């Protein structure tokens, strides 16, 4: 179909986003051009700056435009002694929204996957081991995803922590709040039963 080359280029560029297919990209492109050109310009400027200026924190490896992110440079967080290990920067945002954690993080940017050739050094475990050896860390909270690879990664890190006499704990997995028991898969239910706790009055 004969159309604007720039419009086609815009649609193809939008398809790099996760979950955006041809139809969604077309709809987004037309919306920006028809209704919100100023918003499109802001988006372009923000993307350009983010792509060129955002790197990784030297301590935890999350995304930041500084050498060390705001969380890692916070004195109160440093005094906490806890490090929460997650697979991606998005996991930090999810945990921070709960308001239940006041320590620092370490981002793996993935998980161990020998079949894909992803080993310990590929996910920064050499850097994590260095922190275990040099910093006063009292507990490592393993918040990797509840997948086979996530569990294997958590177990590997737990063994690493044991070598440095640092306590390692795993976040609980179980039945979601508001969910119905009959709809929960067997693996999740098994984790729930294994991780049960006493009710205290």
UniProtKB/Swiss-Prot annotation:
PROSITE patterns: RECR, TOPRIM
UniProt-recorded Gene Ontology molecular function terms: DNA binding; zinc ion binding
Pfam family, one: RecR_C
Residues in C4-type zinc fingers: 57-72
Residues annotated as domain Toprim: 81-176
Keyword annotations from UniProtKB, A to Z: DNA damage, DNA recombination, DNA repair, Metal-binding, Zinc, Zinc-finger
BP-aspect Gene Ontology terms: DNA recombination; DNA repair
Biological role: May play a role in DNA repair. It seems to be involved in an RecBC-independent recombinational process of DNA repair. It may act with RecF and RecO.
Family, as annotated: Belongs to the RecR family.
PANTHER family from the UniProt entry: RECOMBINATION PROTEIN RECR (PTHR30446:SF0)
HAMAP family xrefs: RecR
Protein's recorded name: Recombination protein RecR
Provenance organism: Shigella dysenteriae serotype 1 (strain Sd197)
Lineage: Bacteria, Pseudomonadati, Pseudomonadota, Gammaproteobacteria, Enterobacterales
Gene: recR
